Amino acid sequence: MKITFESFLYGMPSRDYIHQQADYDTQIQAAARKLKQADYVLIGAGAGMSTAAGAKYGGTFFEDHFAEFQERYGKGSYMQDMYSAGFYPYPDEESYWGYWSKQAMLGGICLDVTPLHKLLLNALKEKNLFVLSTNADGQFEKAGLSTDQIFCTQGDYFHIQCANACHNKLYDARKLFKQMDQARNNCKIPTYMVPKCPVCGGPMDMNLTG
């Protein structure tokens, strides 16, 4: 059976799939058969997968780990969760990296691989896999896939880049973020730790999109 972009499990147009004609058990069995027959598998993963696996971004988790940032910047619309806080207009680079180094640590670097990600990849270990993900937490790499099998459309928590885009190279910042995390004081890092582009000398930025 030829699969087109409009097809789903039962050959019906995906635009009509909201009107389901089979129960979930039947759909799951059909999906399992197709996965077994497939030579190549493309995994699409969004924030819902990491959330289902137990990742925390807001609520009491944010209040417990980012209380000093809420105290300094207020509990307005920004300081509610790790997503919103990333858009706060931090007054200087020391403050910007003071926040982002912590988010990188808690949102990616310090996270262990989740059982859900390991379970998924183990179930598909005999297949040729590629992952297209909007997640920045690096879970698929931690679960065992090589970086050439993963494309993170919104970047990740592990790299930084020239804010002026003077060149395309990404720089691994995991060691730097750990140092920033230890040196942070009053939500800011020391000025000497602020990263600068090695090519143009300008500011650096997270390898992330909004």
Predicted region positions:
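Conserved catalytic core of sirtuin-type NAD+-dependent deacylases
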Residues: 1-210
